[in-house]
Amino acid sequence: KAVAQQVSHLEAVALLGLVASLNRGVDAVGNPFKHGGTAYVRGAALDPLKLKGEAQFQRLCRKLEAGVDFLQTQPVYHRPQVEAMGEVLQRACQTVGCPRPKLLIGMVPPRTAEIARHFNRSIPG
C-alpha cells in the first residue's frame, strides 16, 4: 500500500517523473485520473558554477531524460559562464538525444549602490 510523502522527500528527477505521470493522467501510485491528465510544465534548477564535474553532468542528463521543459539557473553575471553552460547543455542534449530545453538565466539586479559594490566584491564574474 502506498504511503503519502512530503514533496521535500522527492529529489528533482523523481519529481519530474511524477509530474510527467500526472500529465499522462496517472497519479503517484498508478491510478488513472477520471478526467485526463494535467498540463504542468516541468522545470528544474541548473547551477552554472557546478557544471564542471562528471557527476553534475550526469545529473543534468537525468533531468533531460526525465523530460524537463525548462532550466532555471542560479544568478549569472559573467558571459563566459553563460556560454560554457550553453556548451555543456548542448553536449548533454546530444548525449541524451533530446531537444534543448528553454534556459532561463537567473539574475538579481542590485537595488542600491551598496548592494552593487557588494556584488562586485563578492560574486564571481
What is each model feature region?
Residues 52-64:
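Short, acidic/polar
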Residues 2-7, 54:
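Short, solvent-exposed loop/turn segments at secondary-structure boundaries
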Residues 63, 67, 105:
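Conserved, mostly hydrophobic/aromatic
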Residues 6-38, 43-50, 93-125:
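Active-site pocket-lining/capping segments in soluble small-molecule metabolic enzymes
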Residues 12-20, 60, 79-86, 90:
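Generic structural signal for well-ordered alpha-helices
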